[in-house]
Structure formats: C-alpha cells, structure tokens
C-alpha cells in the first residue's frame, strides 16, 4: 500500500515539475535581464567615461532613441563623463603640457553616485587608461583593478553595472611607432572575458575597429576620429548604435544618423537639440556638484535649478513626441 502511494506521489511530483517548466515565462524569469529590461526598470541612468562621454553626443543620440521608443516611461540619463579621466589611476609625464595629471575616477566616484542616485550605471573607459604607451602588464593590471573596483562600488551603491569596451584608436590619424589600438584590443578582450563572471559588457571596440577597417578598404582616408581619439558626429552615432542594439532594437540601430532615425519614426528633427540641451544642463550641474580635480570644466547650474530646467525641456520633448505619435 505504501509502495503504491509513494509511486503515486512521485508521479504527481514529476508531472507538476514538467508543467512548471512548460509555463511561459518560467525560463525567462531565471535568465539575465536584457538591455531593454535594465532600462525599463531604471528611473535614473548614469553615464561615466572620459572626454568622449563628457562630450555627450552619443548619450544624447541614445536618449533621442529612448524618448521615441519608451516615451514618458524613458529613464532620465545623466552624463557625468570627465575629460582626461581614467580608471587605471595612471597619467603620462607632461600630460596637458604638465598643467595637471589625468583625473582618477576613484577620487570622485562615491560623490557622483551619492549625487545622482542611479539605478543603472553605463561606463566606458580604456582609451586613456593605457596612457598611449605600448602594452605593459603593470598598466593592464591597473586597468583591470580599476574596472573591478568601479563595478564593486556601483553595485554596493545599489545600482546595476554595464560596461562598454573602449573605442577604436585610429593609428592612421595619430600614428605611433606601435599600434595603440592593439593595446585596446587586449583591454577589450579582457572585458569581454568578464561576461563569464556575470558582467554585462557591450562590445564597442570590436565592431568599431571592424567598421573603420572595412570602410578603409575602399576609402583609405576614412575616419570617424580626425585626431585619432575623439569621434566626429558619425563616430558618436556609431557608439549610440551599439547601445541601441544592446537595448534590442536592431532596426533603429541600422539608421544612418540620428536624423534618419527620427525621420523613420516620423519624429521632428527639432527633438534632437532639445535632448542635447537637456543632456548638457544635467551633465554640467551634476559633474560640478560631485566635484573633481580637473581644471577647465564648466561649472553649470546648481542641481535644483538644472533639474527644473531639464523638466521644462522634458515637457517640450514630450509634447513633440506625443504630437508626432498621433
């Protein structure tokens, strides 16, 4: 009797287990969140990086996609990039003509996180971290350690962490007696390898290197970085495209430019300068509020005034998006 009962209970248990596996959504519940998931679950997204991020153009381009995709559910993007910055804590001799060493993110990170209170942090470092010298294990170790500390600090503050591999370095436009892009290959390969440790990594370096080299096969002078480092409009759009792909929208990421993206979505071009202005107002305010050691950075408005200005711009953005969506 007990044997029959035990067999019956075992059969019921197996059946329930099979049913639970077949219920839609069960597998997804155990999977890692997608880029879109991370964005829709966030109210405030902090961007950290060097001068490329500080310029803010790729952040604004990505924001233009966000506000047309998620509309009033889009998270607020706050750009706190700082020119010359590294996570390696290194600085070459005579940086900036000897006026100041490269700032180290670790010096200001806690203050930035406290000021911004982000739900999600997206960081892009590396092009400055090798200080434009040949590959060296010691410098590489400093970069690895800085990235690990950045991730740990962000997660301790309660935010999710996403990292982009560093951009392409244009050895043709800014030649050295070695390939600095090869150094960044090593940095990028290591970051991609951290995916197996649970890191969320967006690969910018690989696709950017491939795209430039393919274009140069027919246009030898082609570049998206006229000085070898800082992207032009097309370069910033390329970075934004990788973010849009990560967020799951391959179709929009294929647009040739931000204006093409807006046109395809039947959105007015006037949306883009509003998004760019909002980005600039918040960037200048929060970078100044957190404080840093780099001279020559615009102070910006006090945070409360900047937030009020950003809210005015957000209303104009919402009006444009809502009107175009009807």
Language-model features, listed with the residues they occupy:
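Conserved catalytic region of serine esterases and O-acyltransferases that act on ester linkages
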Residues: 29, 40-41, 57, 197, ...
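Substrate-gating cap/lid alpha-helix
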Residues: 171-205
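Solvent-exposed loop/turn segments at secondary-structure junctions
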Residues: 51-54, 82-88, 120, 126-132, ...
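Oxyanion-hole/transition-state-stabilizing segment in secreted/luminal serine hydrolases
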Residues: 38, 48, 58-60, 89-93, ...
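Bacterial N-terminal signal peptides that target proteins for export
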Residues: 2-12
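Bacterial N-terminal signal peptides
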Residues: 11-20
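A short helix->loop->beta-strand "cap" motif at the edges of active sites that frequently abuts
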Residues: 155-160, 199
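Serine-esterase "nucleophile elbow" of acetyl-processing enzymes
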Residues: 27-84, 88-91, 99, 109-117, ...
């Amino acid at each position: 009797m007990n044997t029959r009962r035990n067999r019956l209970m075992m059969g019921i248990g197996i059946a329930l287990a099979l049913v639970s596996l077949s219920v839609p959504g069960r597998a997804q519940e155990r999977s890692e969140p997608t880029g879109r998931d991370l964005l829709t679950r966030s109210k405030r997204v902090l961007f950290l990086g060097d001068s490329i991020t500080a310029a803010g153009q790729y952040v604004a381009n990505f924001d233009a996609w966000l506000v047309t995709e998620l509309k009033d559910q889009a998270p607020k993007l706050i750009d706190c990039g700082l020119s010359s910055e590294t996570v390696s804590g290194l600085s070459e001799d005579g940086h900036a003509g000897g006026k100041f060493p490269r700032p180290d993110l670790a010096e200001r990170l806690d203050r930035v996180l406290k000021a911004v209170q982000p739900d999600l942090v997206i960081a892009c470092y590396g092009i400055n971290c090798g200080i434009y010298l040949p590959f060296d294990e010691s410098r590489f170790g400093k970069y690895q350690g800085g990235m690990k500390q950045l991730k740990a600090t962000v997660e301790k503050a309660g935010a999710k962490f996403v990292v982009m591999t560093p951009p392409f370095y244009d050895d043709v436009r800014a030649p050295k007696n070695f390939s600095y892009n090869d150094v960044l290959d090593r940095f990028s390969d290591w970051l991609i390898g951290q995916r197996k440790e649970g890191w969320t990594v967006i690969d910018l370096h690989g696709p950017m290197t491939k795209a430039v080299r393919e274009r140069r096969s027919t246009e030898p002078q082609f570049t998206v970085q006229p000085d070898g480092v800082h992207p032009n409009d097309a370069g910033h759009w390329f970075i934004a495209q990788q973010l849009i792909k990560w967020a799951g929208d391959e179709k929009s990421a294929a647009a040739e430019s931000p204006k093409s993206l807006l046109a395809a979505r039947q959105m007015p071009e006037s949306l883009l300068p509003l998004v760019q202005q909002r980005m600039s107002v918040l960037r200048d305010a929060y970078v100044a509020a957190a404080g840093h050691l780099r001279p020559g950075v615009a102070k910006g408005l006090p945070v409360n005034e900047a937030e009020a200005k950003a809210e005015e711009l957000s209303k104009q953005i919402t009006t444009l998006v809502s009107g175009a969506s009807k």
